[in-house]
From Swiss-Prot:
Superkingdom of source: Eukaryota
Protein name according to UniProt: Adenylate cyclase type 9
Low complexity composition bias: residue spans: 46-55
Co-factor(s): Mg(2+); Mn(2+)
Amino acid sequence: MASPVNQQLLHHTEVRCDGSGDGSSVTVRINRQHHQAPSRRCKYSISSSCSSGESGVKKTGGSGGARRQKKLPQLFERSTSNWWNPKFDSNNLEEACVERCFPQTQRRFRYALMYLSVAGLLWSIYFSVHMKTKLVSHLVPTLCFLIVCLGFFFFTFTKSYARHCTAISLLVTLLVFTLTLASQFQVLNPGLGSDSLSNLTSFSATGSSSCLSQVGSFSICVEVLLLLYTVMHLPLYLSACLGVAYSILFETFGYHFRDESCFVLLVGRMAHWELLSKALLHVCIHAIGVHLFIMSEVRSRSTFLKVGQSIMHGKDLEVEKALKERMIHSVMPRIIADDLMKQGDDESENSVKRHSASSPKSRKKKSSIQKTPIIFRPFKMQRIEQVSILFADIVGFTKMSANKSAHALVGLLNDLFGRFDRLCEETKCEKISTLGDCYYCVAGCPEPRPDHAYCCIEMGLGMIEAIDQFCQEKKEMVNMRVGVHTGTVLCGILGMRRFKFDVWSNDVNLANLMEQLGVAGKVHISEKTARYLDDRYLMEDSMVVERLGQIVAADQLKGLKTFLISGGRTRVPSCSCSQTLIPVQEGTDLSSPSLAPHVQAAISETSDSHTNCTQPETLKSCPSCGETAARDGPEEGVSAANGGGEEWKGGAPRPSAIGASLKDPERSPESSTGDTLTNSQASLYDMLQEKGRWCGVSMDQSALLPLRFKNIREKTDAHFVEVIKEDSLMKDYFFKPPINPLSLNFLDKELETSYRASYQEEVIRMAPVKTFASATFSSLQDVLLNYFIFVLLSVACLLKPGTNTVSPPTLALVLLSVCGLLGFLSLLVSVRMAFYLEDMLLCTRRLLEIISGWVPRHFIGTVLVCLPAAVIFSYLSSDFYTDIHYTMFLCSALLIPMVQYCNFCQLSSSALLLATITGATMLILIYLPLCPQRPPLDPGTDIEANLSTSNSSYETLDNPRTELPFTRLGQEIAVAYFLLLLLVWFLNREFDVSYRLHYHGDVEADLHRTKIQSMRDQADWLLRNIIPYHVAEQLKVSQSYSKNHDDAGVIFASIVNFSEFYEENYEGGKECYRALNELIGDFDELLSKPHYSCIEKIKTIGATYMAASGLNPSQCQDSSQPHRHLQTLFEFAKEMMSVVDEFNNNMLWFNFKLRIGFNHGPLTAGVIGTTKLLYDIWGDTVNIASRMDTTGVECRIQASEESYRVLVKMGYDFDYRGTVNVKGKGQMKTYHFPKCTDNGGLVPHHQLCISPDIRVQVDGSIGRSPTDEISSLVTGGKGAVELGSGEAERKREKAEERGRDGGAR
């Protein structure tokens, strides 16, 4: 097992960050996340991500836990500290955000022009109906403005607008300022007296007027300021300066140039109270505008980051998926791998937990489909007919490896088997495994193909040519002996750990025999295989009888006729990598269906490049292997591949296609990703380097963290920008959001439900406030601004009664007190929910969790947002026809609560309804006065004077013409309120969409992040089942892995009577292997126990289980107990015996018998292969451990003398067996465990004599004993390789001692 530090690099990692709020200081921590099933209420959820710039530390629980810092959060992730100019702290991000969000800005500006045009058109209609004398002076500027707006609208569709959008917005703003301020220049009429009755008579005589009341003009001012802050897209400081200047000029011109003939009843200058009150109203509208501006920028940039993260996560997802495919394809064929990955994609949660399926907690057998419990684990094994099987052995390998060190030996095997792996892909064969110096593969399995025999023949001939090239490059003298047979096989995977795809059948055994009885340099085929071939090959009789004798031919071949193939009749020599031996079949799918099109294209290009390499002369530019043939050149110019990666012996790394694609700055990320991931010839080193590189980039890009050095941050930002520019998701995201265009609900009902519950979930999780866009802090801002507006409006409404020393209405005072108390309490609760929620009592938190639900929160928010409007209505109901100036001010003040509905984005579904009700109520109060019996009086007198006015005034005012001002006032306010409602509706819609898009971006990023983590866990789990984790960590920094271990333990455990259980007549033996799979799965479950973490399963060889301990140096650092791992391995062997006994108790008619061999000592561990990786161990220690098994006694553990001396000191009692004959070692003393008791009987004498040299495998296969693997050639003390007794003796002994090999059938 890897150390905790190393484990964080790949498995269950999470990046968390603490930002200081200004984005200038970020600390990155990598925390270990325990693998546990999350409890989610719904499909969509938001979790704390590393990109959020978390500004606090979560409280760990208890009063003594760390408390979060209570400080103002940053505006948004990666924002600068300048709140008056919200922007990213990176120029790359800021420019990309402006560019990607430009379509949204452009669309909003067009809407603004359309709104201005509609407003101008409505006011033109109003003026044309009501004005008689100044028709031209009002209509001409308005019509000109409409034409200008139309021109700007069409200009936004040109490319020039993108370059001058800010200047255009500023020009339109100044134009609107000029036009609206011009209406304030109203000519004074000195001919009018100050007497109200005379003015009324004069007005009645003319019957016309040409100006707006202060309600209409103030509504225009409000609309202009809202447009300035929300859709003109000018910098905040510029918008604020322009807005303040506009407010000052608006009120100044309105105060000095008011036309007293506009409304006769409104005669009189502005009072000081009105001037101050209007100033407070402007403060309110500017506060609302600034808040809308900041939150719009915050949400747009946050959404940009979230969508960008989704894009990056999508790229990472593709990388992780391709990486997972390559890793899983290294242990099983594509068709089986695709089925497994499809199941993992459909059931991601199950795929994440797949590793736990082999844990001790899940001892009950799993069921994948049936609802009723079954006793077997999921098991897939197929019986396929017409499959060609190839076995190939290196002739002369013993002599070649005699003077090689272990590291050099692994390197040679890697180089040679790497060539075979590439050749296997080209010939469409499926590699099964390597057995020492033996290589075997199949064709037509698991995907049937009619040319399976040709594939194997081409593979065999290509291997012969490849080893010839190998000999010329390495100056060695070796050759290949190849055997091919065609028949029926069982194919599948056994076990739950360190699994590999394998084949079993008697025909597999016969193919192995073809290789043993073959001739070096030729392909030995059976008569059945020859029936599938035509005359394209040079075929001759094998002459087995003449070469080996009649007895051998009769006993082993049993009359089977065989042939030798020396080559093709028109065969063209191939390069050293043996490419393009057969043409690629039309319609062959070279790519995974799950990869993106650009990845498939890269595979096709790679395949095409392979076809160009056909002759030895072209070795200098072979694109598939990258090798250069230098037959006559110096030795240091020859390339060698170690650990699956190629390197120059001269020292400098060779530039490869993979390296070039990743290091070329001119290439796009997509193309480099495709080239990197689709080259099936990439080694494990390349795979791990890609995983480390892309996973690291994924963390940097998805989190967008300004890591400790500026250059790193700039590089990651530049890469982030480069990737999102090539993706259309950003544009589609803003133009085609996944929401209903009418109701603004998400199209996904489950997502809508999750959205409505998101606020409550955040309160329940006590999520820390990270940015202004956080749900709880956003609500706090809304409540704070609402209370601020409420206070200012209350003060403004109290100024008039205060100046007249008249007490305000009782209803208004009571309502003011109640509303003020409610607003203050809501503000306190919002502050506590945002910053101090964890400090509250449990019952209080439960109450807040309840009221934070969708319905309670909307009800409370509706009450709060209506408080300012309720206060104003209380004044209107009392003083409506008492003071017309005060009434008009209240009508103007009522515009502020209507605008304020834009702030509550979380209540946007009901905000428009509330604003509509408010405006409609105002119009009803104007058209249907509450006191119709009381005539409107002169505003210049006090209330008492108005009440004592003479009856003659009533008679004068009974004229119907006197109602015209109020009729026009109602119509004017109706137009003003309608336009304001239209603007509020537009802004509400835009902000609601942006708020939902921000949430959807969070969800998408979180789902991608979760899925990527799931795939990383799957890939990590697969990687652990290919090679040990500590080996994978080493291969990240080195191109090869081979390590000598001085003290490692090895066991071989065989089911000795499985051959009696195995029967091919029933379903081809499939159900027999199902039982074996169950037993091996039980052995694998033992390894899942933490106590056995130091034990590594090496492989299964038929019905033999091989495991070792002491292979991880980080777990063997306890100098006080250097042999502790041996005790653990021995305990594991004992428990295997118990598992077999328990398994036999569940068997109805058969009892398996387990035999275990134990040994320890020095050995060599390494990884060989490129496309099909194999972690294996070699050495005398492995050889003796295998002999301890093959010469052992059933139901007992046989240990060597050296292991006995170590184990007996640990308290284990052994029986001394005596000496047994071990090939290569002579007579060895062995010991048995457990020790026989007096009444337990002696071990039968016939078992003591068991010393088979030829053993038929339990599944009927004839295999190669691990003693004949190259492990037997490595001496324990010096790491050198033993020399054999001669090639003739080796041929004779190999035919006799193929007992059990590393997986041959």
